[in-house]
Design a protein with these regions (language model features):
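Glycoside hydrolase catalytic-domain context in secreted enzymes
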Residues: 1-399, 423-1003
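Short beta-strand elements
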Residues: 399-427
Length: 1003
């Protein structure tokens, strides 16, 4: 064995324990009347709801396609819990209904039903159950995902009629009732007004051990400590984005920066059911400010606020609290939200009576606003406007108390420019955006002129009025004065958005890199750069035009160059590139675990929203460190995640992957996850950059967003992940941003990402992305052009017919993901070499992307393996049913037009064995697989052989005894990609395969 190989161990028990903790700590307890939870020892429980037999471990699409041996759902976990007794007769009733009414499965990708049809119940069923039980638990399930938004209809956003009827009847029969919401995102909560259950919990989608986390909370083994990452409004219509969230090709972000609580806490407090950051516990906490200090280093971003907060568990059971810190900033010329989250911290597990001191150091840059039109006198600049700044601390945005009442966190007399930027990404379409204004002005003598917070005189008057009261009452009264007197002065207005004034193409031309003279035949390899024997420039100068055109192409899905069944290979996609020591780097779908389409098992994690609801950076880091070890074991270098778009609207189908309506929380949780992966030498690819906040028509959707809203909301999470989390890989989105596809948007992937944030990694497109035509990127100021046929472009991309690579490379989006064959660059329609010849692309721009790719590849595990320094990971304590063996490499056999017959006579067919087959097929075509073989068992035998595509069973072929004769089983399948992996699983001994014939079906 090479002495440089690292030997590492992945303890499956510890991995499971950490995921289970996350699945418990992310649960949000919204209501617990009469303290019906936790369940007492010996509680008799009736479990209602069809969802008990259809637990959703994650949402749908690439973010949830993790192949697992077993999912422990809520019902199974409850049945195995020894401290409670389940109503078995009621469970059997649901079993019978499920057998007679099989779950709906949909027709494939983007077509899974949001929920299953509920079982009708009678009053008699509920009364009988109530006689046998102490409490009813009703389970409601929902899913959505990639290519599948939620809808404002029953069974999706709204409860169905049968679900409402179930809740009514259970409420009428039971004195104690809890509702569990197994959903990927928040749903309509109006049922609370009518049914009023005693306890309500969002249990989200907890991955493969999610049910265990739920039961830990229900029984009190874990005290709930999750907090909402979104505002739950009274109705869908209350969200300010709703009128511009739809199914067309244009989404106008008219609400601007006023997303989620930034809107509700400013002007619609009465439309909130549960505020951002809300979450109950089985105990109570007292939060007190012990120190607030301003460190005056110099004006601007280096100023910090030091804050010490003491948290005491004043209840009678151990628990954890989440302390949230919000800023209140002067309205100034720009207008601000009433509160903005600037930090948070979670306590340790505090026993009853125990205290913990939490120390915050908050850069005041987090208080700054972006001026995209020059209202402050500093255009394209982060600015602290003059006035008073206050801090509010609490367990949610609504209940946070001002801790700087006497003097303010700090005050400034003149505007402070914090960081000067360049105009970038501004809209090309004029529209009116929401602004915040105040009804209190200096001209109104009966009201204070300073409306952005209580003045010192206000505070003094309030303090005098309640001098005899206790400290807590004083804080409450001051808070009351602040809100009632000043916050209600804010109101909504609309003003024209600032539009683009620069020439994008001119900026590209003025910043072209210098070309490296071609240096043929030097014989340098990438490890020479790694070892310091040559520079990256010297190495890149060796690449020919052809090799430069190859290296900007990722190969997939299921490239034979890397782990079978993964999303793509990039870097060494041709023999010439590999001879130069450039490894083939493997990336795989995430973020809820690895998607291994070869059929091997992987760990399915809780969904992104649930992980963010923990408000726990360290837990997220630890969990993703385990995932990093699992990636090493499977030779996966990059996980395509985390997904960090903003919950702009509750109906976005992909909200389950994303974290929050708040960009700061999003960036902090993303940074923790990225750091966990990087501890193991692997990377996360943050996505989808940016404004991917809808799935309907996501390839053609143009998001019209102000530069201020982009920088403060939709880019902020990415910025934090890059600057603090040190993310080294970014994936652009499918759609357009202010008139240009993000895959070809120079100001996004170069001006902002690289030049302003200091990013030095790689940027890749989403899979089979559309690239904006050159006439759009060169003349995109109007935002008006004839859009191409997106469906045709997608079909062409699947089959390797490509367009407009020049616009992608010119934007410094380094990698097109994906092509069927990375080494072949002729005849596929990509314009890379033609653009070089015509002068629409320079060799220097290709060299720039090649250097980005090589710098990244040089630090991957793939590179370490190439030079004998890789890791060997051993899994300990894995269950016997987990297929965690290292994935074998698979040969892809091309199926010609006349078909292919593959000899299977050497396949053992031993019970429990698997056989992998790889085929190169035409994407989008339908194929017939005809298996021939014999069964040695008796004629009444029923020997199962299951045919899988990835982890999805296409058909279980039941073989009866054939007495040596040949029998045939046929399966049809429509492909979505070129390289496809199939698996035969032999459930019993006895079947001897002869061959399989694959033919393309006629359309």
């Amino acid at each position: 064995m090479d002495n440089h190989i690292r030997l590492q161990t992945l303890d499956w028990d510890e991995y499971t324990k950490t995921a289970r903790q996350a699945a418990a700590d992310g649960i949000v307890l919204l209501r617990n009347e009469k303290s019906v939870l936790p369940l007492s020892e010996g509680s008799r429980v009736s479990l209602f709801g069809r969802a008990q037999l259809s637990y959703y471990k994650s949402g749908t699409g690439s973010g949830g396609m993790v192949n697992v041996a077993h999912v422990t759902g809520i019902r199974e976990a409850l049945e195995n819990e020894k401290s409670i007794r389940m109503n078995r007769e009621l469970l059997h009733l649901y079993d019978r209904f499920n057998d007679e009414n099989p779950p709906r499965t949909g027709n494939g990708w983007g077509d899974d039903p949001w929920s299953q049809d509920e079982m009708p119940v009678t009053d008699a069923i509920c009364r009988e159950a109530a006689e046998e039980s102490d409490i009813a638990i009703v389970l409601i399930g929902r899913t959505a995902g990639e290519d599948r938004d939620n809808r404002d209809e029953e069974g999706s956003w709204k409860l169905s009629g049968l679900e409402l009827d179930l809740l009514r009847k259970v409420r009428g029969a039971f004195g104690r009732m809890a509702v569990l919401l197994n959903t990927g995102n928040i749903i309509d909560m109006s049922f609370l007004d009518e049914v009023s259950p005693d306890a309500v919990l969002y249990v989200w989608q907890g991955g493969m051990v999610g049910g265990l986390g739920v039961v830990d909370v229900l029984t009190g083994r874990v005290n709930p400590s999750g907090h909402l990452t979104d505002t739950i409004a009274l109705s869908l219509e209350d969200y300010p984005s709703v009128k511009n969230f739809g199914t067309g090709d244009l989404d106008i972000y008219q609400e601007d920066i006023y997303v989620g609580y930034r809107y509700f806490e400013s002007v619609a407090r009465d439309r909130v059911r549960f505020p951002f950051g809300y979450g109950l516990s089985y105990t109570s906490f007292e939060i007190r400010s012990r120190k607030v200090e301003t460190h005056e280093r110099e004006a601007g971003s280096r100023l910090t606020i030091d804050l010490d907060i003491e948290v005491t568990n004043v209840g009678d059971t151990a628990g954890r609290s989440v302390v949230q810190v919000y800023a209140r900033c002067p309205q100034g010329s720009l207008g601000k939200a009433a509160r903005v989250l600037v930090d948070f911290m979670k306590t340790d597990l505090l026993e009853a009576g125990q205290s913990q001191l939490l120390s915050f150091r908050i850069p005041v840059r987090r208080f700054a606003s972006y001026d995209d039109e020059g209202a402050t006198g500093d255009v394209s600049c982060w600015v602290l406007e003059e006035g008073r700044y206050d801090l509010y601390v609490g367990e949610n945005v609504r209940d946070a108390v001002c801790v700087t009442a006497e003097s303010g966190a700090f005050s400034i007399s003149n505007n402070w420019p914090i960081e000067q930027m360049e105009e970038a990404l501004m809209p090309v379409r004029p529209f009116d955006r929401m602004v915040m204004k105040s009804s209190i002005t200096e001209e109104e003598p009966d009201t204070p002129a300073y409306i952005d917070g209580p003045t010192a005189a206000d505070i003094a008057a309030a303090a005098s009025a309640i001098a005899a009261a206790g400290q807590e009452e004083q804080e409450d009264e001051v808070q009351h004065i602040d809100r009632d007197r000043f916050d209600r002065a804010l109101y909504i207005d609309y003003e024209p958005v600032a539009v683009r004034s620069i020439d994008d193409y001119k900026r590209i031309f003025e910043n072209l890199p210098a070309e490296l003279p071609y240096a043929l035949g030097k014989g340098l390899v990438l490890n020479d750069v790694r070892e310091g024997r040559c520079t990256m420039d010297e190495f890149i100068a060796q690449l020919s035009d052809k090799e430069l055109a190859q290296i900007v192409r990722g190969e997939g899905m299921g490239s034979p160059l890397v782990t079978p069944g993964t999303a793509a290979a990039f870097g060494g996609v041709s023999e010439d590139l590999r001879e130069m020591g450039i490894p083939a780097v493997c990336c795989d779908d995430g973020p809820s675990g690895m998607r291994l389409d070869c059929g091997n098992h992987a760990f399915s994690l809780p969904n992104g929203t649930m992980l963010a609801c923990t408000f726990d950076r360290e837990l997220n880091r630890k969990l993703f460190s385990f995932l990093g070890l699992e990636m090493l074991k499977n030779r996966v270098d990059c996980l395509l995640g985390p997904g960090i778009n903003i919950h702009r609207n509750p109906l976005n189908g992909r909200n389950f992957e994303y974290f929050s309506e708040d960009p700061f929380l999003t960036g902090e949780i993303a940074s923790a996850q990225i750091q966990g992966l990087q501890e193991q030498g692997v990377s996360g690819v943050i996505k989808h950059f940016c404004a991917n906040n809808r799935e309907s028509r996501r390839r053609t959707m143009d998001s019209a967003v102000s530069e201020r809203a982009l920088r403060e909301i939709y880019l902020k999470g990415f910025e934090i992940a890059v600057r603090e989390g040190k993310a080294r890989a970014v994936m652009t989105s499918y759609g357009l941003l202010n008139g240009i596809h993000t895959s070809s948007l120079y100001d996004l992937t170069t001006t902002v990402l690289r030049e302003e944030w200091g990013f030095d990694g790689i940027v890749m497109t989403d899979w089979w992305s559309t690239l904006s035509p050159k006439d759009v990127t060169e003349n995109g100021l109007t935002g008006e052009y004839e859009k191409p046929d997106e469906d045709r472009l997608f079909r062409d991309a699947l089959n390797g017919k490509l367009y407009d690579f020049s616009s992608m490379v010119r934007a410094q989006n380094d990698l097109y993901m994906v092509v069927p064959d990375g080494k072949t660059i002729s005849g596929d329609g990509a314009d890379t070499l033609d653009a070089l010849e015509e002068g629409r692309l320079t060799r220097a721009e290709l060299q720039r992307s090649a250097a980005n790719i090589c710098r990244f590849a040089m630090e991957t595990e793939a590179m370490r393996r190439l030079v004998g320094e890789g890791s060997t990971v051993t899994v300990e304590n894995a269950p016997e049913d987990e297929n965690l063996d290292s994935v074998e490499m698979v040969e892809y056999r091309k199926v010609p037009e006349q078909g292919l017959v593959l000899d299977l006579s050497q396949v053992s067919g031993e019970k429990g064995s698997d056989y992998l087959m790889g085929f190169e097929l035409e994407a989008g075509a339908e194929y017939l697989f005809e298996f021939e073989g014999s069964c040695r068992a008796g004629e009444l035998a029923q020997v199962p052989v299951t045919f899988f595509f990835t982890g999805i069973p296409l058909k279980t072929m039941i073989w009866n005894g054939t007495d040596g004769d040949i029998a045939c089983h046929a399966v049809s399948f429509r492909t979505r990609k070129r390289n496809n992996i199939f698996r035969l699983h032999f459930g019993q001994n006895g079947v001897r395969m002869r061959d399989v014939k694959i033919t393309k079906c006629r359309e």
